[in-house]
Amino acid sequence: MTVIVTGAAGFIGANIVKALNERGESRIIAVDNLTRADKFRNLVDCEIDDYLDKTEFVERFTRGDFGKVRAVFHEGACSDTMETDGRYMMDNNFRYSRAVLDACLAQGAQFLYASSAAIYGGSTRFVEEREVEAPLNVYGYSKFLFDQVIRRVLPSAKSQIAGFRYFNVYGPRETHKGRMASVAFHNFNQFRAEGKVKLFGEYNGYAPGEQTRDFVSVEDVAKVNLFFFDHPEKSGIFNLGTGRAQPFNDIASTVVNTLRALDNLPPLTLAQQVEQGLIEYVAFPDALRGKYQCFTQADQTKLRGAGYDAPFLTVQEGVDRYVRWLSGQV
């Protein structure tokens, strides 16, 4: 049967396509918007059956043009948290997602979709409960509102609906994202260009570089998606993070040491990297004060309760792999 991936040329979508290929799945319809044409590179080493622009996909899917569809991985969205055009954001992320959901429900196809930890906004608790959800931007609101639709639909749904609140994802195939790419990507490029990595200094009681995030490898994101693909009886909204907050210092230090290893140089401690000027702390910008999350950490209770028991890569493991991959692309 056919599998459809929206946002297939994007960061997470392309990694899901590749992961499906590695399992022998090639009857894949890739859906995307290639106005940013450079995204095509993410699919060059992937096998797909067909490609459709997002503007024609929903109508054709609703009409039944693709025969029996097993599942839709709905990864397509505007993920720019700085986007201020609310009308565009709601049409692209909310209305379009509702149309894809309706078509999946009508045809009995599994619906696995990208939600976001941005739904939690400034919360200090990250559990899939309405009372801790308070998005701070229209991107987060578009994801939040769609999750509310899912909560209403789930009790009567006859086919799988699984949403994943992605935390800070990093890894291969994100180059096209530019300023919205991960901190690991930017640290890598900054170190190659300047010989050092710059991080924010002290802020809100956190020591320099010690602000933390739940950084999750796209490898693990793809694995979780495929676990639910294999278990169509499991539905719900799930946090998708490691459950382990790590500081930005860990990202920067791993980037530096991996690049040193590739140059046959010994690893250095964080203190040594700072002392040698390989990591530099800059004053926290006034523009971000009061708008910056110093801590995120996924509560994995629901995900583990659904049966996903595989370990997640640490920053040290995942960023090391990613830097080696990036170095091979240069």
Swiss-Prot record:
Q: Which residues form the active site?
A: Y139 (proton acceptor), K177 (proton acceptor)
For the ligand (substrate), the binding residues are N168, R179, H186, F200, G201, E202, Y203, R213, Y292
Reaction catalysed by this enzyme: ADP-D-glycero-beta-D-manno-heptose = ADP-L-glycero-beta-D-manno-heptose
Name of one Pfam family that matches: Epimerase
Which top-level enzyme class is recorded in the Swiss-Prot or TrEMBL entry? Answer: isomerase
Its EC number(s): 5.1.3.20
Q: Does the keyword Isomerase apply?
A: yes
Q: Name one GO molecular function term.
A: NADP binding
- Describe cofactor binding as the record notes it: Binds 1 NADP(+) per subunit.
Entry text on domains: Contains a large N-terminal NADP-binding domain, and a smaller C-terminal substrate-binding domain.
Please give the family membership noted in the entry: Belongs to the NAD(P)-dependent epimerase/dehydratase family. HldD subfamily.
The name under which this protein is listed is: ADP-L-glycero-D-manno-heptose-6-epimerase
Record the organism.
Burkholderia ambifaria (strain MC40-6)
Give the gene name: hldD
